[in-house]
Regions:
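Flexible loop/turn segments at secondary-structure boundaries
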Residues: 47-49, 71-73, 110-114, 168-172, ...
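Noncatalytic carbohydrate-binding groove/subsite architecture in carbohydrate-active enzymes
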Residues: 3-140
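Aromatic/acidic polysaccharide-binding cleft in carbohydrate-active enzymes
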Residues: 103-196, 213-219
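Trp/Gly-enriched beta-strand surface patches
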Residues: 253-287
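Structured loop/turn residues at beta-strand edges in well-structured enzyme cores
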Residues: 58, 156, 295
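A structural motif corresponding to the C-terminal end of an alpha-helix
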Residues: 29-35, 91-102, 148-160, 202-209
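Carbohydrate-binding surface patches
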Residues: 216-253, 258-265, 300
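C-terminal beta-strand-rich structural cap/linker in extracellular carbohydrate-active enzymes
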Residues: 273-307
Length: 307
């Protein structure tokens, strides 16, 4: 089924927001074939375009915009500092779209195209990565950053979020053919990228109640938590290129299991998902607390049994 139709006009999409006439035209031609499907408008550009030119929401069933953390700077610290701003974009958008659903479509590590271009650009160099491709897509850093992004947007109140692509160098796993430029994007055919496991964690929590975590160093760690029946699941991401000790409390008494996505387990996570899923460690809960050392850019998936 079609979840939603997002309407853009090619001449407006990247620099402004969807005009009422295009919303009405799309609805006129498509609504009969897609009964009950919401028609969403907004911008194919950044939140700045939406904020500068709020759309006529009376013609829309929802509002959409894109997010990427590399409009200005590309270093890891800047990308981490951009995580919290994602929450703020949703809160600001809520101010002019009211109760309409907010769809972030999509979230990417790099801008999908050059919004600053005012004329046709020269063809990309076939020996270089396309401008929209970040070689960190296949990295542990991307997985940790994505944990923070999901947390930030969900806490902000986004109704739906589309991330990345399914396969290829902007996706969750490599294609069967492999990277077109393996010397620049160092994946291998069929490789499962670390970010895949963040979405596996989310999929495993379908229908669960999501909980809020609190931490005292927001630029060092990020995380997600859910409760589903007697299961308590927590994903903790190390946002730093150094090891860090994390204390989880209050933790249910008994034992916890943890599956670690880090430099030691990445080989199995990338090639043998069945094996990686079985690579869990048992941790003791002492005085209502679990202590765990996260390796650089590690994402650790904890599970507790509630009694």
């Amino acid at each position: 089924p079609v979840a939603r139709v997002i309407v853009f006009h090619e001449a407006e999409a990247s620099l402004g927001t969807t005009s009422r006439q295009w919303m009405e035209l799309a609805r006129h031609h498509l609504a009969g074939a897609l009964p009950g499907t919401p028609f969403v408008g907004g911008t194919d550009g950044n939140f700045a375009e939406l904020n500068r030119q709020p759309p006529d929401v009376s013609a829309m069933d929802g509002v959409s915009y894109t997010i990427n953390p590399q409009v200005h700077l590309t270093d890891e610290r800047s990308l981490i500092e951009a995580i919290e701003a994602q929450h703020d974009t949703v809160v600001t958008a809520r101010g002019f779209c009211g109760a309409l659903p907010i769809s972030i479509s999509s979230v990417t590590l790099k801008p999908p195209f050059n919004q600053a271009a005012r004329e046709d650009e020269a063809p990309p160099d076939p020996n270089e990565l396309p401008p929209a491709v970040d070689p960190r897509q296949m990295s542990l850093f991307a997985a940790a950053w994505t944990v923070g992004s999901v947390r930030s947007l969900s806490w902000g109140g986004a109704d739906s979020v589309t991330y990345y692509e399914t396969t290829g160098w902007r996706g969750l796993m490599e294609t069967e053919q492999g990277s077109p430029l393996p010397e620049k994007f160092r994946s291998f055919p069929g490789m499962i990228f670390p970010v895949y496991w963040v979405f596996a964690f989310l999929a495993d929590a379908r229908g669960a109640a999501w909980l809020r975590l609190r931490w005292d160093q927001p630029l060092l760690l990020d995380g997600l938590a859910f409760q589903q029946g007697d299961r308590l699941g927590i994903a903790v991401a190390n946002l730093q290129p150094r090891s860090q000790e994390v204390h989880l409390s209050p933790a249910p008494e008994g034992e916890a299991t943890v599956r670690r996505l880090n430099e030691d387990t990445m080989a199995a996570a990338s090639t043998d998902p069945a094996s990686f899923v079985q690579q869990s460690e048992t941790l003791a809960v002492n005085a209502g607390q679990v202590v765990h050392t996260l390796k650089p850019y590690e994402t650790a998936f904890f599970e507790f049994k509630l009694v």
